[in-house]
Amino acid sequence: MRYVTYIVLLILVVIFFSPLNFFNTNSEIINYLIRTFYHANLQHLLANSFSFYMLSFLEDVMGHAKFAFCIIFIWILSSMLLLAEHTAFPSRKVYTVGFSGVIFGLIVVYLMSLGKNRGLSIAGLVLSIIPQFFVSGISYEGHICGMIAGFVYVVLFPLPKGSVDNQVAMF
């Protein structure tokens, strides 16, 4: 059972449909952390929820605790990287929301843990970022910060090479 996956999905849905506004705090750091769980509309929530679920096989590979730690690590680091980028370049400060930074981080964890064809897969991930520069409403900064956080996670807490080979998302 993918407990962590279902808990995260439940949190995303509850926050989306909640009448409470968790976003307006007095702390910029808290605001950046909370943005990850907000979604612009139902389509955004469904797209991110589906993408996250497709990566939930990592919970089977890593175990519940390590998968939860991985998500929390990527979430916090990518949020802080985004805050640092917006602090360093205030003109780039935009309202960014959504779980996709964490999703991109998990994709990096998956790709870096592949045995064969890892380089080709990573090149595909990098190429997937390019169209985002030409489409409005997509936070490529959030995706890149998530990718960086995923890379840092793999460097600090590597999965055995090939541990995710032949793994597929199961419904």
Curated annotation (Swiss-Prot):
Its main location: membrane. The active site is at S100, H143. The keyword Membrane applies. This is Putative rhomboid protein L523. Keywords: Hydrolase, Membrane, Protease, Serine protease, Transmembrane, Transmembrane helix. One of its GO terms (biological process) is proteolysis. Its EC number is 3.4.21.-. It comes from Acanthamoeba polyphaga mimivirus (APMV). It is a multi-pass membrane protein.
